[in-house]
Amino acid sequence: MKFLQSLNGRPLRVWGLAALVAWLIFQVTRLALLGHSVMLSEQAPAGLLGGVAMGMLRDLPVVLMLAWPWAMFELIFKRKWADRLRWPLWTIYVFTLIFVGVSEGVFWDEFSVRFNFIAVDYLVFTTEVIGNIRESYPVGKIVAALAAFTLLIVWALRRPLRNAVAAESGRASQLVWALSLMLAVCFIGYKLPLPEFFTNSFANELADNGWRSFIAAARQNKLDYRQFYATRPDAEVMADLQRFSGHGQVSASNTGLLKASHAPSKQPNVVVIMMESMSAEYMETFGNKQGITPNLDRLAKEGLLFTRLYATGTRTVRGLEALSAALPPQPGAAVVRWPNITNLNTLGSTLAARGWEPNFIYGGYGMFDNMNSYFESQAYKVTDRKLFQEGLVQFENVWGVADEHLFDQVLINMDKDVAAGKHVFAHIMTTSNHRPFTYPDGRIDIPSPAKREGGVKYADYAIGRFFEMAKQKPWFDNTIFLIVADHCASSSGKTKIPVFRYHIPAIIYAPKLVVPKQVDTLASQIDLVPTLLAMLGLEGDDHFVGRDILKMPPEEGRALLSTYQNVGYLKGDLMTVLQPKRKIETFRISADGKEAQLVPNEQKMTDEAIAYFQGAALLMEKHGESGRGSGR
């Protein structure tokens, strides 16, 4: 421990020791994440070492930020109180550093990134998150082990800390150090940019620091498109957006007058089943050999299958946004998370104007991610786990009830509404294919709790069971079902927007109404809303940005993808990525979507990309200006 006691032969001060300990723990954390990337994400070590080296420098402002309170501690407290408080606070400090490092490992295992806006959200929705952690990991044993390890580290550091205390000088000198640290943090941490130096996203994440990324995400949970991204004249953007949508008007507000189409007695029910984290790669239809989705594969053969459909994002709220408002993804938080958004142009409002009864049915607590508030504000009738029929739920975990119980509630709701003469539109959100992957025993041949394969197979079992029961209902033959994922199970990849991590299944199933077919046109999640409306005979009644996939020329197919800060426009094998600071890059995407080669920007692609994403921002601005975005 001698190297912890002095630097260049001079004894460390307390803040210096605190800084050095933090820096060392950051390096251990980074090496652990490097090992995870190499062994589990199959990344080449040589491509990541630059990120590791860069990260050692990027840690400095965070290290100084963590050291500054120790300089203030020694300055403010008199020796008597400082001696009493120093060891307990030092123990808490070391434990916090270790705990955050382990937490970063858990988060990386799930998302392959440093802390981001998802981690910020997790601190808001503590019930689900803490419950999920408790059900997924032996928390008590982990915390006990971390506490024991902390005590061991503190004991090992007892002499360096004593020497550091002895090295403290007069208050004038301590004040100079405290002010110097504060200025250094402000200058290095806020004035100097932190660009992405590497084309490999894993390397960029390794070069970052979890403390820094968390603070940045907390400060930037909503991004103003005009301020940060490339723009074009508004009039040109809106003209292009109307042309791309295939009709004369697009809108964020529900202001359109719907034409008469179906007679009320012939209106089919519409059921959208959004499956949690159901990546296309899990289905045999798309090449999987594990046999974990037999029911989905059967439905894909018997229904209308979209083989090249891509999610707009990597979170449930993005999927909900796409399948309700059909808006291109915007940087920052999804519209579902925005407060006080009312009377938005949604699939539910469009159908409600023609006599359907909109419902949102969720297996979890709808307060999570603002789901209940969002859908209630759009005039959906909301049913979450709190409102399920008493005695119905026999199995649940922190994220939600078992999918089979969710579907049982759906059947109850639909029976009741149909019996009352209503035409039902139900948007259903499942939860079982989510960590901790627990489900009722005896349903599938993978025991619970399980890994992802178990969650996928149980979710497939539940949907198969649902359709077997639904087929016995008198309303089944007059119901159109859309089965689609909210997003993929993983968002990790080597590129800024790893295309293969956005490929999701989408199946329209209605044996008496829809002819089985395979559609290979490249399409976006937002296109499913106009496609459904066109199938219902309501083509032209909507004002959405998406297009009817069935009438879209294959050469005009495109997908809209997003991370938190980057938005991508995929057309053919090219993807244009719009980034903060008005940066634009274009990549040639490999056939499997896993590789991306940087190529020169193409003006036509750039203009189209800006039209979609700037256009979405303009629609929401106009929505707010109309007064329809004000409080309920």
Where are the regions that the model predicts?
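Short coil/turn linker and secondary-structure boundary residues
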Residues: 7, 43, 120, 124-125, ...
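Short alpha-helical "patches" and their helix-cap loops
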Residues: 84, 225-236, 336-340, 546-547
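Short coil-to-helix leader/linker segments, especially the first N-terminal amphipathic alpha-helix
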Residues: 221-223, 227-259
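Long, well-ordered, tryptophan-enriched scaffold segments
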Residues: 138-140, 144, 236-240, 375
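Short coil/turn segments at secondary-structure boundaries
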Residues: 145, 197, 226-232, 427-429
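Transmembrane and membrane-interface helices of multi-pass
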Residues: 2-224
